Amino acid sequence: MKKKMILGALAILMLLPVHAQIAWKQVEPGVWKGVVGTPEDYSLLDVAAVTPLKESFARLPEVALPALANEIVGSIQDGKTSLRIPLQKKEQLYGFGLNFQTVHQRGKILNLHVDHYGGKDNGRTHAPVPFYISSLGYGVFINSARYLTVYAGSGARKDSPNAPVAKDRNTDKTWTASPYSDAVSTLVPAPGAEIYIFAGPTPMDVFRRYNLFCGGGTLPPRWGL
C-alpha cells in the first residue's frame, strides 16, 4: 500500500508544471537570448544559417536589457513549453508574420501555421513568424520551428494580479468574451524553447536589430514594392 501511495504521488508530481528560471545572455548589442527547458535541435535560426551583421550593430543606440525580461515566466508540462510575457495596459503589438487585413495584433488568438490564407488574420498564412514588436520599444522572437499558439493579450488568468472580475453572462450586461489580459502567452509543443529579446529604444530600432541579427535581409524585387 505504501509503495502504491509513493508511486501515485510521483505520478501527480509529473503532471504538475515545472517552472523554469530564465537566464539572459547578451548575444549581440541590444539582443539577449534565454532558454527554457531543452530546445529541439531543429530551429528556425539553424535552418536559416544566417550570420548577424555585427559591424552594423555599432550604429545603433546603446541599450540595457528591458525590465520586463525579469518578469517573463517559462514552464514545462506534458512535454510542452509555455511562455508568458507581461503586457502593460495600453501596450500594442505588431508582427507575427504576414497579415492581410490587420496591423494591431493585441487581443487575438493566433495559430502560427504555414497554410493557405483562409480570409482571416489568425496566424494561418503563407508566412507566419514567431516575432512581434511592442509599442513600448522591444521585440520578442521565439526560435522554434513548431506550430505555435499565441494568446496575444487574449488570455485571462486567475493567478494574475490584474485578473478580471468574474461576471455572469446571463445577468451582467457588462460581461465580455474578451476580458482584459496582461500577458502574451505562447504554447510551444516541445520540451523547451529559445527566446530572444530585442531592445529599442524605438520600435524601428527593434526592427533594425532583428533585421541585422537575421543577416541583414535582402533588397526586395521592384514588383514587390
Question: Where on the chain are the PLM-derived regions?
Answer:
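Bacterial N-terminal signal peptides
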Residues: 8-17
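Catalytic and substrate-binding clefts that recognize carbohydrates or anionic sugar/phosphate headgroups
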Residues: 21-222
